[in-house]
């Protein structure tokens, strides 16, 4: 089968987008082994995540599915959500600028701004351990986490997918490649976890690196940016609107506090279109 795809990125976090509304048969062929082959940057297309556009099932405008480079399906991807919104608008699947999108963890609402950037209502952050999921006796702003022979301090939150965020003094010296895999696979996170490393510059600016579950470190992570900011706000360290600087560029994150949704704003870029044999 020939598969049509569009390559996109949000701050260097790169994706291929598959229109399964026009290519419903593609879902039959996209098993984990095929996704891993397509994700290979030497022998395939190369991407951090594969995004699928499907018909809505629960009253939204579209259904949004995400697969990591290892072939596993995940609940949410913030940079991908912005690319998803630009894709359905640019390819005339909708004429709306605000779109209701179904995900595995509920509805998100991307809005295409006049300057071409996309703002996404990512929903209300979840801090209860059972909702993350994270094995802890009670909800706390900071948890100790044993990593090998050392104990680190993390904050834990779900932004539709699980995140563990730690504050470090210098992002350039962050142990992302050594600690990231250990945090990702920590037994207290039964569904694994995205590991965030945050440096606070001031109350309105942070720097961030994220080791993503099933992918590794990426140039940017939208849900990771949301997670870092809401954890910083919860601990009284950040203001309600924060600029998050990552290797791939900047996102603006806003959270007005308890029971309020977190908003993410940033770019979504189309790189090229292509066809590949499955």
From Swiss-Prot:
Keywords: Amino-acid biosynthesis, Cytoplasm, Isomerase, Lysine biosynthesis. One of its GO terms (molecular function) is diaminopimelate epimerase activity. It catalyses: (2S,6S)-2,6-diaminopimelate = meso-2,6-diaminopimelate. GO terms for cellular component: cytosol. The record marks 163, 212 as: Could be important to modulate the pK values of the two catalytic cysteine residues. The gene is dapF. Pfam families: DAP_epimerase. GO terms for biological process: lysine biosynthetic process via diaminopimelate. This is Diaminopimelate epimerase. Catalyzes the stereoinversion of LL-2,6-diaminopimelate (L,L-DAP) to meso-diaminopimelate (meso-DAP), a precursor of L-lysine and an essential component of the bacterial peptidoglycan. Homodimer. InterPro entries: DAP_epimerase_AS, DAP_epimerase_DapF. The keyword Membrane does not apply.
């Amino acid at each position: 089968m020939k598969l049509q795809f569009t390559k996109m990125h949000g701050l260097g976090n790169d994706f291929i987008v598959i229109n399964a509304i026009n290519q419903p048969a593609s879902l039959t062929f996209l098993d984990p082994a095929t996704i891993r082959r397509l994700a290979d940057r030497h022998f395939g297309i190369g991407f951090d995540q594969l995004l699928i556009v499907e018909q809505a099932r629960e009253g939204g405008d579209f259904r949004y599915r995400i697969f990591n480079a290892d072939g596993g399906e995940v609940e949410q991807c913030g940079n991908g959500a912005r690319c998803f919104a630009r894709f359905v608008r640019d390819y005339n699947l909708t004429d709306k600028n605000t779109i209701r999108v179904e995900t595995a963890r509920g509805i998100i609402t991307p809005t295409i701004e006049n300057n071409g950037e996309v703002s996404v209502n990512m929903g209300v952050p979840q801090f209860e351990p059972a909702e993350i999921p994270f094995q802890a006796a009670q909800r706390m702003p900071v948890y100790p986490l044993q990593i090998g022979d050392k104990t680190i301090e993390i904050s834990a939150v779900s932004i539709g997918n699980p995140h563990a965020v730690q504050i470090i003094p210098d992002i350039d010296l962050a142990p992302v490649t050594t600690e990231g895999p250990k945090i990702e696979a920590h037994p207290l996170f039964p569904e694994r976890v995205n590991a965030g490393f945050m440096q606070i510059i001031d109350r309105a600016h942070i720097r961030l690196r994220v080791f993503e579950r099933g992918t590794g470190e990426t140039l940017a992570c939208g849900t990771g940016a949301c997670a870092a900011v809401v954890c910083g706000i919860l601990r009284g360290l950040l203001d309600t609107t924060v600029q998050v600087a990552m290797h791939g560029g900047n996102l603006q994150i806003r959270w007005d506090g308890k029971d309020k949704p977190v908003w993410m704003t940033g770019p979504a870029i189309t790189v090229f279109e292509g066809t590949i044999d499955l």
